[in-house]
Amino acid sequence: MDSYSIIIKPHVTEKTMNLIDKNNEITFVVKRDANKGQIKRAFEELYEEKVARVTTHITPRGNKVAFIKLVEEEMAEELAVKIGVF
């Protein structure tokens, strides 16, 4: 799968904004059939940042959301500004 087809868009809510500040995690809506390894590789390829872990869940609306924890502190906030979340 292509990296651009795996990661669809940032998932922005009040909760995800708090995760950026407190847990160094950023969230994205991803392709439903993508697994954690594919999501990690796609994120590292697109944004050139190291990933510590990926957790996922499927929302009641049927969207798959990936919570991506970054290795370096403060990188999630900088990345969010870079991609236009803030």
Curated annotation (Swiss-Prot):
For biological process, the GO terms are: translation
- What UniProt keywords apply to this chain's record, in alphabetical order? Ribonucleoprotein, Ribosomal protein, RNA-binding, rRNA-binding
Annotated GO CC locations: ribonucleoprotein complex; ribosome
The source's domain of life comes to Archaea
Which Gene Ontology MF annotations are present?
rRNA binding; structural constituent of ribosome
Subunit structure, briefly? Answer: Part of the 50S ribosomal subunit. Contacts protein L29.
Q: What does this protein do?
A: Binds to 23S rRNA. One of the proteins that surrounds the polypeptide exit tunnel on the outside of the ribosome.
> What Pfam family is a match, any one?
Ribosomal_L23
Give the family, as the similarity comment puts it.
Answer: Belongs to the universal ribosomal protein uL23 family.
User: What NCBIfam families is this protein classified in?
Assistant: PRK14548.1, uL23_arch
- Keyword RNA-binding assigned: yes
Please state what the protein is called: Large ribosomal subunit protein uL23
What SUPFAM superfamilies does the record point to? Ribosomal proteins S24e, L23 and L15e
Zinc is among the record's keywords: no
